[in-house]
């Protein structure tokens, strides 16, 4: 009982613990009827190849644990039935054994297989069957820490991931970031599993980065030294920190021998062994006796010793001094009990309740316990504590797997400890594997120790690393001086990279080795060096003087280089300076260069114009020279560049860069300067920025600020000039007028220019700003009655009502804050005036918009351009619309193809048509109707009548030639040829006209009827444009005359056809119309209509009437009688203009253009009479082109008449 120690780490005792501890002091016998038998299933490994977890060398630990529990006063009410089945670390066998234990036999508790693969399956099955499952042996993988996945698994082994995080914490403390990972080959890959978790910890650790340069397996046998050497040689060239996972004693000793042979036991190397077996530098004794020679403080035999000595014990011990071992605590509460366990474990395996009867178990009595037998002892001991605690508190929960699992955590309520678990504290007992405590993940809380050998070759704990659930590791140091950890390294921590590098070729050279030759050389050349230094000293002095002269030469300008420009060039620059900006100057010819730069002289320096001011010659010292050098270096957008000073003439000339627009005083003084508020802001802002730059420069003040010293460049940017020359006297005594810009304190005193302070510049800036805002000279002297002396006197007098310029904006809208700022700047008290920095900041906030003045001007021009583009686009649209209207109007007057040629300036040649049909109509008794109407009523009558006629025309392939008074002339077959359909189009048009007239009503004469007389003729015709002014599309030929005669010889409401028209109609459209012969009629043709034909009778002609359509033959065609109610809506004029070509080959028949009167039309209702005795010809017909066409169309008779006409014309000219 004295060997069981409970340690309360983070709280006090609880009632449950009190019950446990009370049972340790008094053991009450339990009646047999009340005793309970715990059925335990053990998934074991029998193979002798797995000695570290083999059941023959491990199973006796359960009997010893049961005996230990009884001796300590626990499990008094329990008996145990142990049932063993073997898995041999096979997954399928593990599944079979798990099914047998948990499903078939339903054991109270199962001790799982000590291998990871079958244990994973059994842990999953335990979750399903809610069976408590105990883990030991090689089960260290981090996946077994998932309490949600394996809630019934309790693992006595610490997980290797915690080992990995603790190792990385050590790396961080020692500043090791380059390591090698070695692991022993094993049938179960147990060392590889640990190394993989270590590598996972290295990758997941966020606070420190470690580079794994080698990850390699080392053989565990004795026959692979060459492979071992190859691995170690690879490490030697890459790193010095070696981490190794080697579990058993023999491979560990071999590792010590191999690193000794490969010279890896120097002060540069650190070898770290990882383990979870609580053995540190020790090993299990070879026999059943306890360690008696050179034992470690843990009671174990050192790993480097073998009996009998093979000659390597001492060398292996020296190699072990280069080792650090990270393992579970090896502290054992009772070394005597450890020795008893070691000697009896093998013999106990055949005793009940284990009762192993195999041959291996019977032979195990002479063998030492396996490497993990102690962990089996501790896990069963832990289970015994848990069931005892449940039996004493709530025996019903003995059948509750979850309650048993929770009881094994040895938890109790109390103050929480965030280091381990946020709601529970953890109790610890000391077992054979050290301190044992289970966390909330049902996994052992690892208390890892870092062991090293001290000067007595005994292991000592130098660090205590405890891993918590949140992934962190807390470190408790076991030393006060780190040098004690590195006792075998002369007290110095090894470096990640040796000083000389991994191959020893990068050692830093000593001073003598590196600089010895130089030291000896220096001794030989000291004399020469001293001489050289003296020479260099004088050379430097000379060079400094030359450099100073060179720098002075930069600002010293020879007078001969300043050339006076010609007078013409002066005038050109003057005009340029005034004209190129936002100004309203109208007469620039009167502006001269002199009044643009009234305060400066103009010169050319290196072909560039410059400005200059004259000063009397004076003595200049070095300070003045340095000032001029600094002046040349001043550079700011609002500071005029100081070019230099000419001092070799009768007077000094200060040269400044040219600003082509002149001074602000001169520009405002012209009186014709127009600016907007933004320009005002820009100028004032530029002056303030320039003044701010000067105040922050070495000058600290301008001291001569006025509108005359503010120049404007081509970009309308204000630049301050005439600064920094305070030590140079003025050529003349300063004019009284300049005092208008001086501050009152300057006027009152006798201050020299270099004594003027910054507030005086602020005052001058305010005066200039008033000039800009009012666009008038300072104090508006041209309109004031006061003289300059009076104003200066009042300024000097000061007082509460001191005089200041008027800020009359003359209707310009300006930010009121700017006016307030200006008034503050010319305050009487200099201390009340704001500084240049404050003024600049305020002006930035007041600016109506960002950007400079040129951007403003460009924006104005851009807006103007945009507006102009919009206006041009609108005007273009209007022009296009008007052009379209004109084209539509022209299309009504002339055929489109004719109009297009005329618009292109081309000649329109007459065109002959072989067959057309001409239509003439006349209103019957129109003269009598006109007498009954007013002129306006006559116009309205004809407009209503002919407008509807025009609409009817659009439904037929007819072209309207003209209408004169009550006469109406149409033609079909031109200008677009339509074969023989022209006769039908005209007949259909005539019938529709007649039908419409029957329905037509005269509004003011409702009883009167409108009747038409229609004449139709078919035949050849010539059409062309006559004249250049008001051209007309006219028809020529006998066909037109005959058609006119048909109309004049017709009858009211009748359609009169000539024989040619009737023959054409009957030939192509027989039986479609009701016709009748009128008989023979005497027809006469008047002059003009017949081409070059005098009054000559046509003679007797047979003519015909067309009455109506013959519906029996025409059917339901579209050529029925016209109904004005069904008339189609007239299309828009824009749609009437088609895309036909100029040759007239594709004109739509329903879109005839409108034309003017044909001069060749015959007079209406001419009485027939005899022909004239002498031929008379129309002058309209005298056209060479028409004459040529006439010769092509008419017969020999026409040609004879033409020759007769030419003879008469010749006689008339004579």
From Swiss-Prot:
Ranges facing Extracellular side: 19-517
Intrachain S-S bonds: none
Ribosomal protein is among the record's keywords: no
Record-annotated membrane-spanning stretches: 518-538
Glycan attachment residues as annotated in the record: 85, 363, 441, 464
EC number: 4.6.1.2
An annotated GO cellular component: plasma membrane
Segments on the Cytoplasmic side according to the record's topology features: 539-1214
Catalytic activity, as annotated: GTP = 3',5'-cyclic GMP + diphosphate
Keyword Zinc appears in the UniProt entry: no
CDD domains in the record: CHD, PBP1_NPR_GC-like
Sequence segments annotated as region (Disordered): 1116-1197
Tissues and organs where the protein is expressed, per its UniProt entry: Expressed asymmetrically in ASE right (ASER) sensory neuron.
Comp. bias intervals (Acidic residues): 1133-1142
Keywords carried by this UniProt record: Cell membrane, cGMP biosynthesis, Glycoprotein, GTP-binding, Lyase, Membrane, Nucleotide-binding, Receptor, Signal, Transmembrane, Transmembrane helix
Bilayer topology term: Single-pass type I membrane protein
Single GO MF descriptor: peptide receptor activity
Chain ranges of the Protein kinase domain: 572-859
Biological function: Guanylate cyclase involved in the production of the second messenger cGMP.
Domain notes: The protein kinase domain is predicted to be catalytically inactive.
Name used for this protein in its record: Receptor-type guanylate cyclase gcy-19
Biological source species: Caenorhabditis briggsae
